[in-house]
Amino acid sequence: MQMKQTPKSRRVYCAAACMAVAVAAFPAGSQGYPPSQRGTVTQNVAFTAISVTYGRPVARGRELFGALVPWDSVWHPCADSATRVTFNHDVLLEGKPLRAGEYTLWLIPREHAPWTVIVSRAAHVFHKPYPGERFEVLRLDVTPEQVSPVESFAIYFPMVLRDEAVMRLHWGTTAVPIRIKAPFKPEPR
């Protein structure tokens, strides 16, 4: 016994066939996971909350600094959207004052000299192109460290004391430590 097709059943069949073709037409990679995962780290230092949101590129066997990331050029330490760091109170970064707010971080890696960390007030930008000096709030010279390798870029706080901490930007065998002092104290009641 054969079922009679109605105009409605033909439309449903045609729509289902079109959906199947459309799904099959996309390459598997475009339906998969993003190549760089998003990460977030938060840390309280004394009475100051610090939050960092960033993309985590993966080394995938590539030579990183001096190759993938050229020397002496502004580089965004992350993937996709620029790394955002938020402080709810004023802090000192490497001894230099920074007002509470939301910022992005940029680096200038150097082969034989301290690296430059750039703090920019351009808070909601993509990682390319660099938004420019007109948005810069601070430039810090920091000496990178040679450390155990990590495959995925990571930002973390390996040291947290009473009112100070070290935030480390780490990829491959290189880590850039940034000293943070959080002097804010609430008024006694």
Over which residues does each language-model region extend?
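Twin-arginine (Tat) signal peptide motif
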Residues: S9-R11
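Targeting-peptide/extracellular-domain and disordered-appendage signature
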Residues: Q2-T6, A28-R99, T104-R189
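Bacterial N-terminal signal peptides
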Residues: C14-A24
